[in-house]
UniProtKB/Swiss-Prot annotation:
Region (Small ATPAse domain (RuvB-S)) residue spans: 199-271
Gene that specifies this protein: ruvB
Name under which the protein is recorded: Holliday junction branch migration complex subunit RuvB
Cross-referenced Pfam families: AAA_lid_4, RuvB_C, RuvB_N
EC number, as in UniProt: 3.6.4.-
Major subcellular location class: cytoplasm
Comment, domains: Has 3 domains, the large (RuvB-L) and small ATPase (RuvB-S) domains and the C-terminal head (RuvB-H) domain. The head domain binds DNA, while the ATPase domains jointly bind ATP, ADP or are empty depending on the state of the subunit in the translocation cycle. During a single DNA translocation step the structure of each domain remains the same, but their relative positions change.
Cross-referenced InterPro entries: AAA+_ATPase, AAA_lid_4, DNA_helicase_Holl-junc_RuvB, P-loop_NTPase, RuvB-like_N, RuvB_C, WH-like_DNA-bd_sf, WH_DNA-bd_sf
Gene Ontology MF: a single term: ATP binding
Family of the protein in this entry: Belongs to the RuvB family.
UniProt region (Disordered), positions on chain: 1-37
Binding site for DNA: 329, 334
Length: 348
């Protein structure tokens, strides 16, 4: 499977605690064997069982017809495996996967160049697809629906439209903000699937698999502790495991399985607690309690007080805190829960 990657363009500001930031780019570097952590096939992809069932049937049906897979939109919090799933789909279909991101497609020729170079049944993956420009979207409409590219040649009275036929292809879009997609674009995806946060069992399996790939051994308690502290996110689980490995190599005396004490030391070093909250999470909750009586507080006010970006708070920080029952969104703003107060008191 060939992968062409294009990733230019600005990204939203990141939180200081990059270790626990699911938007932070994964550390896989394909030139280093130990970093080949991505699963290659659906059978190797841990978790997201309903998603795998739906996409597995779609892949088998497309292969049976000898046609391209229908266009796929994957959405959900960052770090849950949307890019990995796109690559897995290409592998299952036996085609090339071209990878780019919406901010990199600033000019019409950027997306035209990708589309005209697609081979039959190839897969084009666009990350952050909600950030596509209007011009790029309009070029995609006929490409997705009619496998046709409409180009305007010339200007003014001499302008004319030229149509180019495209081979059957699959567009896989990924987004953390499905509601920000325009209806015409969203409606052209035949498969729209959400990725959910991972459960403890699946995360332990991911940690165990990654540990084997990078050559470390964990006690069951250590594996469980890492899985419980990674915010339900495989990308963070793999990153935490690397930091635990660092501590073990320096403090562990060499040899033997990594135990829970070493995991605890690594988490403490990076200010991550046993539920996966980092210093920024605790600061947000504490600010709501200390300065606003627990809320409600508007998103913009909260972001300004924290010196953070509202979009990052809404798409990266809040989903996990709400999933953990520590934060509520109300029509009047954000509020902490009794569970958040108890957790902060316990951690104090």
């Amino acid at each position: 499977m060939a992968i062409v990657s294009s990733s230019s363009g600005r990204k939203p500001p990141r939180r200081p605690e990059a270790l626990m930031d699911p938007q932070q780019a994964p550390e896989e570097v394909v030139s280093r064997p130990e970093d080949k952590l991505r699963p290659q096939r659906l059978d190797d992809y841990i978790g997201q069982s309903e998603l795998k069932q739906v996409l597995g049937i779609a892949v088998q049906a497309a292969l049976g017809r000898g046609d391209a897979l229908d266009h796929v939109l994957l959405y959900g919090p960052p770090g849950l495996g949307k890019t990995t799933m796109a690559m897995v789909l290409a592998e299952e279909m036996g085609v090339h996967c071209k990878v780019t991101s919406a901010p990199a497609l600033e000019r019409p020729r950027d997306i035209v160049g990708l589309l005209v170079n697609l081979q039959p049944r190839d897969l084009l993956f666009i990350d952050e697809i909600h950030r596509l420009s209007r011009v790029a979207e309009e070029l995609l409409y006929p490409a997705m629906e009619d496998r046709r590219l409409d180009l305007t040649v010339g200007k003014g009275s001499t302008a004319r439209t030229r149509s180019l036929d495209l081979p059957p292809f699959t567009l896989v879009g990924a987004t953390t903000r499905a509601g920000s997609l325009s209806s015409p674009l969203r409606d052209r995806f035949g498969l729209i699937q959400r990725l959910e946060f991972y459960g403890q069992g699946d995360l332990e399996a991911i940690v165990e698999r990654t540990a084997g790939l990078i050559g470390v051994t964990l006690t069951p308690q250590a594996r469980s502790s890492i899985a419980a502290s990674c915010r339900g996110t495989p990308r963070i689980a793999n990153r935490l495991l690397r930091r635990v490995r660092d501590v073990a190599s320096v403090r562990g005396g060499g040899g033997g399985a990594i135990n829970q004490a070493l995991v605890g030391e690594a988490l403490s070093l990076h200010r991550v607690d046993h539920r996966g909250l980092d210093a920024s999470d605790r600061r947000l909750l504490q600010l709501l309690i200390d300065h606003h009586g627990g809320g409600p507080v508007g998103l913009e006010t909260l972001a300004a007080a924290l010196g953070d970006d509202p979009v990052t708070l809404e798409t990266v920080v809040e989903p996990f805190l709400m999933q953990q029952g520590l934060l509520m969104r109300t029509p009047r703003g954000r509020m902490v829960t009794d569970a958040a107060r108890s957790h902060l008191a316990e951690a104090a």
